[in-house]
A protein has these predicted regions:
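Helix-rich terminal scaffold detector
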Residues: 1-13, 36, 109, 113-154
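Short, flexible, solvent-exposed loop/turn segments with mixed acidic/basic and small polar residues
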Residues: 29-33, 63-69, 88-99
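Conserved, well-structured core segments that form or line functional sites
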Residues: 81-127, 131
Length: 154
C-alpha cells in the first residue's frame, strides 16, 4: 500500500490519480483506491481539505498522486440577481449547509427540502452530477471548533 502523507504546493510529474468525493477529501486518514487500482492510505495532517487538482505524495516523494473531485449529486442554483443569491446563502448558511459559491451559482449536496425552500424564494434549482468544492469553512477542522455555548440565534 502507498501512504500519502503530504500535499505538494508546486507542480511535479504525476504518477497516478485518485477520484474522491468531498466526504473523503476532508478525511486525514482513509484507505482509498487509486484510479489505476492500487490501494493507498491517506495519512495527512488533520484539517486539510483536498481540492480537485491537489497533488499528494509519499514521504520519499516516489509517488505524486493528483486528486480529482468526484462528480456528486448536487443541487445547482443559478441566478443573475446578487440579492437573491445572497438571500439563499444566508438561509443555507443558517442551516450549516456546506456550500460551493461561484459568481451567479451555488451548489450544495442535493436535498429536496432545501430545493423547495429556495424555489419559494423565486430561485431556479436544478439537479446535477458535478464535482463539489464547498467553501473551506464547512469542512476544515476549525470550522465548528467554537463552542455553541455563547449567545446567538439560529
Amino acid at each position: 500500500m502507498i501512504y500519502l502523507t503530504q500535499r505538494l504546493d508546486h507542480a511535479h510529474p504525476i504518477t497516478a490519480s485518485v477520484t474522491l468525493p468531498i466526504d473523503l477529501r476532508v478525511k486525514s486518514r482513509a484507505r482509498v483506491a487509486l484510479n489505476d487500482g492500487r490501494e493507498a492510505g491517506l495519512m495527512l495532517p488533520r484539517g486539510l481539505l483536498l481540492r480537485g487538482g491537489d497533488l499528494l505524495t509519499t514521504d520519499d516523494g516516489s509517488e505524486v498522486i493528483e486528486v480529482i473531485a468526484a462528480p456528486e449529486s448536487v443541487s445547482v442554483v443559478r441566478c443573475a440577481d446578487p440579492f437573491l443569491l445572497a438571500r439563499a446563502c444566508y438561509h443555507l448558511g443558517n442551516r450549516h449547509v456546506p456550500l460551493q459559491i461561484m459568481p451567479g451559482e451555488l451548489r450544495y449536496h442535493h436535498d429536496h427540502v432545501l430545493d423547495d425552500m429556495l424555489r419559494q424564494f423565486g430561485l431556479e434549482v436544478t439537479f446535477a452530477s458535478l464535482p463539489f468544492e464547498p467553501e473551506a469553512g464547512a469542512y476544515t477542522s476549525d470550522a465548528h471548533s467554537h463552542s455553541h455555548s455563547h449567545a446567538h440565534s439560529h
